Swiss-Prot record:
Organism, as annotated: Synechococcus elongatus (strain ATCC 33912 / PCC 7942 / FACHB-805) (Anacystis nidulans R2)
Name of the top EC class for this enzyme: ligase
Annotated domain remarks: Consists of three domains: the N-terminal catalytic domain, the editing domain and the C-terminal anticodon-binding domain.
Entry keyword annotation includes Transmembrane helix: no
Localization (cell): Cytoplasm
Family, per entry: Belongs to the class-II aminoacyl-tRNA synthetase family. ProS type 1 subfamily.
GO cellular component, one term: cytosol
Gene: proS
Molecular function via GO: aminoacyl-tRNA deacylase activity; ATP binding; proline-tRNA ligase activity
Family annotation (InterPro entries): aa-tRNA-synt_IIb, aa-tRNA-synth_II, aa-tRNA-synth_II/BPL/LPL, Anticodon-bd, Anticodon-bd_dom_sf, Pro-tRNA-ligase_IIa, Pro-tRNA-synth_IIa_bac-type, Pro-tRNA-Synthase_IIa_type1
Cross-referenced PROSITE patterns: AA_TRNA_LIGASE_II (PS50862)
Protein name in UniProt: Proline--tRNA ligase
Protease recorded as keyword: no
Keywords: Aminoacyl-tRNA synthetase, ATP-binding, Cytoplasm, Ligase, Nucleotide-binding, Protein biosynthesis
PANTHER family: MITOCHONDRIAL RIBOSOME PROTEIN L39/PROLYL-TRNA LIGASE FAMILY MEMBER (PTHR42753), PROLINE--TRNA LIGASE (PTHR42753:SF2)
Length: 600
């Protein structure tokens, strides 16, 4: 391709809208163009990158026996209502674009396709003889992000590969899940990316197990906690660990004490000369279910720990049926205004105890009249602890569960921290890294098939629900994440496997007929050898061309400059900036060798 004929415009300054390096560089280098908030045009160079990523994904999926398909982007609300996710996606999380057609039928623009594919399987899969099946697609998805940011990282429109598998039993599901795990590792390696597979929360997708694939980058939105022995890695939302040991309490007698002005852990510990690990603090939450009911929640947790709201949301979702609901649509720490709406009288905030009476809740048919009481293991194991007395300026010391307070249901709700000990080996401590979630695989189990009545006939003639898995990769996110992982002050450094072109031939002086002729010959020879090559034949200064070549990140640059008089050209490797002068006749072989060494 000749740059003189390409729609190719670069920018010298960083666009004001861009926050992270990869977003700045993709805009500056002419890969993408912003159309609206979270919506981008993929320009010719970017489209080549996306096609390459898609092809690697396609090849690895096909190698597992998965079958490519294409599902509708417009999805009827009825399917999502069957699964119970319509309210979650259109109201609670609010991430689905929804609309009414001219017959006033509700539709959604698909952020994901579990419901559609389950409906297809329900209609077409009848017998165990048809199982297992694994179907995938690569297409545009939509999410109504509250705050689109970081370019293609968190957009409202994006390209994704999603696959869905169907099985007769859980063992078959596990086998496909393992195959997808390996396929994803192959994909990211072939794309030339550094990544880490981590345990993950299943979120609104649901299911019994899931794993994320994180592309390591300082600008990653996700925090990963891992051990140096390589045996544990998890998203902080999912991570578990052993916290620091609690210091033994000096309070051996249960008594109420006046503790004026101690409504924080720090002030309380200073007043009592105690350690935060000896304190049980109460954290108030309120949850709203999809049936409109508000549930007051009282969490007891050790004083030096914090509540992981993802873990709490998951626990509430598991308990939703106990309150006549299907899901949680909001979880918040109530502020003063919110408390006025459901408390019978002002609460002694900062002095709450585990036995805060249910009578503190106002009588209202939309409010569940009893606290959901949960205790984190860090607090459940404490003895002779300090906690609130449910009275302003008073605490109790020397308290014990069951003796002084009923012990609530014990649930892991704490946020794991850097420096915590690992559960698999207490000599290992958790370290932290930032990552960009680029892939996610789930064992969905029976969640969707049971909800939507997708069954098959077993070998014994009985009707059973299908076991399901789903497996996603953000194709457009992978492309930008590659830039976030590999760039320098001069521009992008593409991995060779997904670079839009593998080589660029630069003519420093377009009026020099010898330079032009040599460049044309090299360009033709490289192209004939199957090397994807750009020819920079623009009428621009040499310095502009060199800066643009660095900016757009083509792996190998060939310059037909002054060395031509000796029958040689300069070749530059973008990643290392290593430059050498070689014979014109050696260019094709040299570039071929570099490409072969770079591509896994």
């Amino acid at each position: 391709m000749r740059l003189s004929q390409m729609l190719f415009v670069t920018l010298r300054e960083d666009p004001a809208e861009a926050e992270i390096p990869s977003h700045k560089l993709l805009l500056r280098a002419g890969y993408i163009r912003r159309i609206a908030s979270g919506i981008y045009a993929y320009l010719p160079l970017m489209w080549r990158v996306l096609r390459k990523v898609s092809q690697i994904v396609r090849e690895e999926m096909d190698a597992t026996g998965a079958q490519e398909t294409l599902l509708p982007q417009l999805q009827p609300a009825e399917l999502w209502q069957e699964s119970g996710r319509w309210e979650t996606y259109t109201k609670a999380e609010g991430i689905m674009f929804s609309l009414d057609d001219r017959q006033q039928r509700q539709l959604g623009l698909g952020p994901t396709h579990e419901e559609v594919i389950t409906a297809v399987a329900r209609d077409l899969i009848r017998s165990y003889r048809q199982l297992p099946q694994n179907l995938y697609q690569i297409q545009t998805k939509f999410r109504d992000e509250i705050r689109p940011r970081f370019g293609l990282m968190r957009g409202r429109e994006f390209i994704m590969k999603d696959a869905y598998s169907f099985h007769a039993d859980e063992e078959s599901l596990r086998q496909t899940y393992a195959a997808m795990d390996q396929a994803y590792r192959n994909i990211f390696r072939r794309c030339g990316l550094q990544f880490r597979a981590v345990e993950a929360d299943s979120g609104a997708i649901g299911g019994s197990a899931s794993q994320e694939f994180m592309i390591l980058a300082d600008a990653g939105e996700d925090e990963i906690l891992y051990t140096e022995d390589g045996r544990y890695a998890a998203n902080v939302e999912k991570a578990v660990s052993l916290p620091a040991e609690a210091i033994a309490s000096a309070f051996t007698t249960f008594e109420k004490r006046e503790t004026p002005g101690t409504d924080t852990i720090a002030s309380l510990c200073e007043f009592l000369k105690a350690d935060p690990t000896q304190v049980v603090k109460q954290v108030l939450y309120q949850a709203v279910f999809d049936n409109g009911k508000l549930l007051p929640i009282l969490i007891s947790i050790r004083g030096d720990q914090s509540v992981n709201e993802i873990k709490l949301t998951n626990e509430l979702t598991r308990r939703a049926a106990d309150y006549g609901a299907k899901t949680v649509i909001a979880l918040t720490v109530p502020d003063a205004e919110a408390l006025k709406k459901w408390t019978a009288a002002p609460l002694p905030l900062g002095y709450l105890g585990p036995d805060l009476a249910d009578s503190a809740i106002a009588v209202n048919e939309s409010i569940i009249p009893k606290f959901l009481r949960l205790v984190d293991p860090t607090a459940a194991e404490l003895q002779n602890f300090v906690t609130g007395a449910n009275e302003v300026n008073f605490h109790v010391v020397g308290a014990n569960w069951e003796t002084n307070f009923p012990k609530p249901a014990v649930v892991d709700l704490r946020t794991a921290l850097v420096g915590d000990r690992a559960q698999h080996d207490s000599s290992q401590v958790l370290a932290s890294a930032r990552g960009i979630e680029a892939g996610h695989i789930f064992q969905l189990g029976l969640k969707y098939s049971q909800a939507m009545g997708a069954t098959f006939t077993t070998e014994n003639g009985t009707e059973e629900p299908l076991w399901m898995g789903c497996y996603g990769i953000g194709v457009s996110r992978v492309a930008q994440a590659a830039v976030e992982q590999s760039y320098d002050k001069d521009g992008i450094i593409w991995p060779v496997a997904i670079a839009p072109y593998q080589a660029v031939v630069v003519i420093p002086n377009i009026t020099d007929t010898e330079q032009v002729a040599a460049a044309e010959k090299i360009y033709a020879d490289l192209t004939a050898a199957g090397i994807e090559t750009l020819l920079d034949d623009r009428d621009e200064r040499a310095g502009v061309k060199f800066k643009d070549a660095d900016l757009i990140g083509i792996p190998y640059r060939i310059v037909t400059g002054r060395s031509l008089k000796e029958g040689k050209v300069e070749v530059v490797q973008r990643a290392s900036k290593e430059s050498s002068v070689i014979a014109v006749g050696s260019v094709v072989e040299t570039v071929q060798d570099w490409i072969a060494a770079a591509i896994v």
